[in-house]
Amino acid sequence: MTNLRKTHPLMKIVNSSFIDLPAPSNISSWWNFGSLLGLCLIIQILTGLFLAMHYTSDTMTAFSSVTHICRDVNYGWLIRYLHANGASMFFICLFLHVGRGLYYGSYMYLETWNIGVLLLFAVMATAFMGYVLPWGQMSFWGATVITNLLSAIPYIGSDLVEWIWGGFSVDKATLTRFFAFHFILPFIIAALAGVHLLFLHETGSNNPSGLSSDADKIPFHPYYTIKDILGVLLLILTLTSLVLFSPDLLGDPDNYTPANPLNTPPHIKPEWYFLFAYAILRSIPNKLGGVLALVLSILILAVVPFLHTSKQRSMMFRPFSQCLFWILVADLLTLTWIGGQPVEHPFIIIGQLASILYFLLILVIMPITSLFENNLLKW
C-alpha cells in the first residue's frame, strides 16, 4: 500500500512542501528565515487573537483596555509584550530574508520576489496600524503624520485623507477601521505567503553558489526540518529574553501617555523598523517628493531583478559587489540611526547623503560594478 502521506489529498500537499521536497544540499543558515517568518506570523496571529478578546477599539477606552490587559488579564502582560516584540522579531527576520535574497541573487525568481515585495508592504501596513491601536501619544501622532502624507497626492489628496480618517482628524472612526484592517491583514499575509511558497516550489530554492543544484538534491526532511528547528529555538530564545528581561527596550516611552490631540510630542518618530524609510522621507524638503522617496525606498526592490547585469547570479564570487552590498547595509543602519534623531545639524545633511547613497548604490553603482566584474573575468 502506498504511503498515506503521498496519496491523501491534503497530506500530499504538506508532503511535497515540507517532507519530500527536493532541496539543494548546500543552503546555509541564511535560508532559515522563511520558516522563521512563518513562525513569527503564527505567533503574531495567536497573540493578536487573545489581545483582541480584551481590547476595545474606542478612543475613550482603548488605552485603558491595554492597561487592563497588562494588569488584570491572566498573563496579559506576557501576551501583549510577545505581540509587541514579536513584531520587532518579524522585521528583523524580514530584513535578513530580503538581504539574503539580494546577496545571493534569489530575486531572479521574479514571481516569488515580487510577491515577497508585496508581502513586505502588507507587513509594514499591518505594523503601522497595530502601532496606532494602544492609543498612546506616539500612536495618535504617528497616525496623524503618516496618514497626512497622502494629502501630498495632487488633486485627490485632501479628500483621500479625510476619507481614510472618516472625519476631519484622526478620531474614533480611524481607530475602529485601523483595528478592523489590523485584524484582517495578517490572514491576507498568510494567504500571500502560501502563494510565495507555491511559486518558490515551481523552481526550487536558490543556493549560495547561485548555480543550478538539480544534480545534487536532498530531501527537506530530516535535514532541513532539524536545521529549521535550531533556528526556531534561537528565535524563541531571543524573543522570550527580550519579553521577560526588557520588554520596553524597543518601544517609545511617549506611548505610555494617553493620546492627547492638544499636545504634540517633541519628537514624533515611528518604531525602529520604519526609521530608515522615515529618514528618507524627512531628507527631502518637499512633501510630495518625500512621499515618493518613501514609497520608492521599498518599491525599488521590485526593480532590482532588471538591474542585474552580472553573468553570475550570486555575489559569492564577486568581491567588489560584496563590498558594495555591505556598504548598502551600513547605509541602511545609518538611515535607521538618523530617523531617530531630531531634525537639526548635522543629522539633516547626514540623512540626505545617506538617502542619496541608498538610491545611487542600487540603481547605478552596483549594476556598473557588476559589468566591471564581468570584464575582469573576460566574460
From Swiss-Prot:
Quaternary structure annotation from Swiss-Prot or TrEMBL: The cytochrome bc1 complex contains 11 subunits: 3 respiratory subunits (MT-CYB, CYC1 and UQCRFS1), 2 core proteins (UQCRC1 and UQCRC2) and 6 low-molecular weight proteins (UQCRH/QCR6, UQCRB/QCR7, UQCRQ/QCR8, UQCR10/QCR9, UQCR11/QCR10 and a cleavage product of UQCRFS1). This cytochrome bc1 complex then forms a dimer.
PANTHER family cross-referenced by the UniProt entry: CYTOCHROME B
Q: Extract one GO BP annotation from the record.
A: mitochondrial electron transport, ubiquinol to cytochrome c
The cofactor named in the record is:
heme b
Q: What is this protein called?
A: Cytochrome b
Q: Name one GO molecular function term.
A: ubiquinol-cytochrome-c reductase activity
Q: Which residues bind a ubiquinone?
A: H201
Quote the cellular component terms of the Gene Ontology held in the record.
mitochondrial inner membrane; respiratory chain complex III
- At the top level, the lineage of the source is Eukaryota
Hey, which family's this protein in? Belongs to the cytochrome b family.
Pfam families tied to this protein: Cytochrom_B_C, Cytochrome_B
Query: Which regions span the lipid bilayer?
Result: 33-53, 77-98, 113-133, 178-198, 226-246, 288-308, 320-340, 347-367
Compartment annotation: Mitochondrion inner membrane
Q: Which PROSITE patterns match?
A: CYTB_CTER, CYTB_NTER
Enumerate the residues binding heme b b566.
H97, H196
What does the note under cofactor report? Answer: Binds 2 heme b groups non-covalently.
Quote additional remarks.
Answer: Heme 1 (or BL or b562) is low-potential and absorbs at about 562 nm, and heme 2 (or BH or b566) is high-potential and absorbs at about 566 nm.
Lineage of the species this protein comes from:
Eukaryota, Metazoa, Chordata, Craniata, Vertebrata
Residues noted as binding heme b b562 in the record, renumbered to the chain: H83, H182
Outline what the protein does.
Component of the ubiquinol-cytochrome c reductase complex (complex III or cytochrome b-c1 complex) that is part of the mitochondrial respiratory chain. The b-c1 complex mediates electron transfer from ubiquinol to cytochrome c. Contributes to the generation of a proton gradient across the mitochondrial membrane that is then used for ATP synthesis.
| Keywords, ordered alphabetically | Electron transport, Heme, Iron, Membrane, Metal-binding, Mitochondrion, Mitochondrion inner membrane, Respiratory chain, Transmembrane, Transmembrane helix, Transport, Ubiquinone
